[in-house]
Amino acid sequence: MEYVEPLAPLYGGEYSTTGIVTLSVGIALLVLANAFAYALVKAFGIQSYYGRLLGGIVLLVLSMLLTLSTNSINKFRGAFTFAIGEIIIGGLDVINDKSGWSQPVVSPTVGCQGGA
């Protein structure tokens, strides 16, 4: 009997560390981190753009812990990318707030905006 190698490897092979998987993991962790940051914003009554910075920090810590536990940075590249972006945007918003500028760089909207 002859062994035939499958055309597509099983999950956990080379495709588990490619773009779509890392992007999906990054988006899932981003949603989780932002939900946690939103809860912190609501619990402590701080400005919403501080939540973006907190969400980025939480996401970075989560992705670091997952990377250490699985010993594979390739699966969590998307999470690191989203975390760094959240920290940069949140940090710029905090700097703008401390500088006394009128508007944050990216103002998050909550709820639906009604049309005219």
Curated annotation (Swiss-Prot):
Q: What is its main location?
A: host cell
The alphabetical list of record keywords is: Host membrane, Membrane, Transmembrane, Transmembrane helix
The portions of this protein that span the membrane are 20-40, 53-73, 76-96
Q: Where in the cell is it found?
A: Host membrane
**What GO terms fall under cellular component here?**
host cell membrane; membrane
Membrane topology designation? Multi-pass membrane protein
State what protein this is by name: Putative transmembrane protein ORF116
Organism, by scientific name, is Acidianus bottle-shaped virus (isolate Italy/Pozzuoli)
